[in-house]
């Protein structure tokens, strides 16, 4: 049985808007195990991105707990660096660095071996069809290619959990399928859990579990 690596317990998120309280999430629960592929769907504005930000320790819940069992890190920035990987719809690549340099950056920040980082990054980029674009600058890449570089960057530190917000939103169907196959490989071979917010229902139904966020609650779809 796979170990539990993330627990969202009774999570609520409320905002003050003048004298009005805006309730985004209410008493939401989610348990994530090693190697699980989880998709979260829901209408725009339903709180999906807020949920990912809380799970990724980028935002604090109004109530509830984010529990990462057995993590050797206590400080949030260290957990984010060593334990979590993030993919956003916007790639956020560093424009003055090559595709390869963008991918290895998190590994170098972690103080790990550069040679090994280059080897791993080259393999990931090749798996994503970018083996001939290693030394291209972001400005020389298409939108889909930039997003694939960002996906490769999220994988370089071999995180326990990847949090992906519309990771294939700018990709064509063929590349979307390649990304899913890479996610599947990472989940099965490295026991990495992937939590993905998506509007792509075909992709969502390929995942191990599918949840729908509606009326501030998360339910099996």
UniProtKB/Swiss-Prot annotation:
> What Gene Ontology terms describe what this protein does at the molecular function level?
ATP binding; ATP hydrolysis activity
Q: What class of enzyme is it?
A: translocase
Q: Which UniProt keywords apply?
A: ATP-binding, Cell inner membrane, Cell membrane, Membrane, Nucleotide-binding, Translocase, Transport
- Give the UniProt subcellular location, in the record's own words: Cell inner membrane
- Give every ABC transporter domain span: 6-220
Q: Which SMART domains match?
A: AAA
Question: Which stretches are transmembrane?
Answer: none
Question: What Enzyme Commission number does this protein have?
Answer: 7.6.2.-
Q: Which InterPro entries match?
A: AAA+_ATPase, ABC_transporter-like_ATP-bd, ABC_transporter-like_CS, MacB-like_ATP-bd, P-loop_NTPase
Provide GO CC annotations from the record.
Answer: plasma membrane
Q: How does this protein sit in the membrane?
A: Peripheral membrane protein
Q: Does the keyword Ribosomal protein apply?
A: no
User: Does the keyword Protease feature in the UniProt annotation?
Assistant: no
Q: How does it assemble?
A: The complex is composed of two ATP-binding proteins (LolD) and two transmembrane proteins (LolC and LolE).
The role this protein plays is: Part of the ABC transporter complex LolCDE involved in the translocation of mature outer membrane-directed lipoproteins, from the inner membrane to the periplasmic chaperone, LolA. Responsible for the formation of the LolA-lipoprotein complex in an ATP-dependent manner.
Put simply, this protein is called: Lipoprotein-releasing system ATP-binding protein LolD
- What is the scientific name of the source organism? Rickettsia conorii (strain ATCC VR-613 / Malish 7)
Q: Which gene encodes it?
A: lolD
């Amino acid at each position: 049985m796979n170990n539990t690596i993330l627990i969202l317990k009774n999570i609520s998120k409320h905002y003050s808007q003048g004298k009005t309280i805006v309730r985004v999430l209410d008493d939401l629960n989610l348990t994530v195990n090693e190697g699980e592929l989880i998709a979260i769907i829901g209408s725009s504005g339903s709180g999906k991105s807020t949920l990912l930000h809380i799970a990724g320790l980028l935002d604090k819940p109004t109530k509830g707990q984010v529990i990462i069992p057995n993590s050797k890190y206590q400080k949030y920035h260290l957990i984010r660096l060593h334990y979590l990987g993030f993919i956003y719809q916007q790639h956020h690549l560093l424009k003055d660095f090559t595709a390869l340099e963008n991918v290895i950056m998190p590994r170098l920040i972690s103080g790990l071996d550069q040679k090994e980082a280059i080897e791993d990054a080259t393999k990931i980029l090749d798996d994503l069809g970018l083996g001939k674009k290693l030394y291209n600058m972001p400005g020389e890449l298409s939108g889909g290619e930039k997003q694939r570089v960002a996906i490769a960057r999220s994988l370089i530190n071999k995180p326990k959990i990847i949090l992906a917000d519309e990771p294939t939103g700018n990709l064509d169907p063929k590349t979307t399928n390649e990304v899913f196959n890479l996610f599947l490989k990472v989940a099965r071979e490295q026991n990495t859990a992937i939590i993905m917010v998506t509007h792509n229902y075909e992709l969502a139904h390929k995942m191990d579990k599918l949840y729908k966020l509606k009326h501030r609650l998360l339910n099996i779809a």
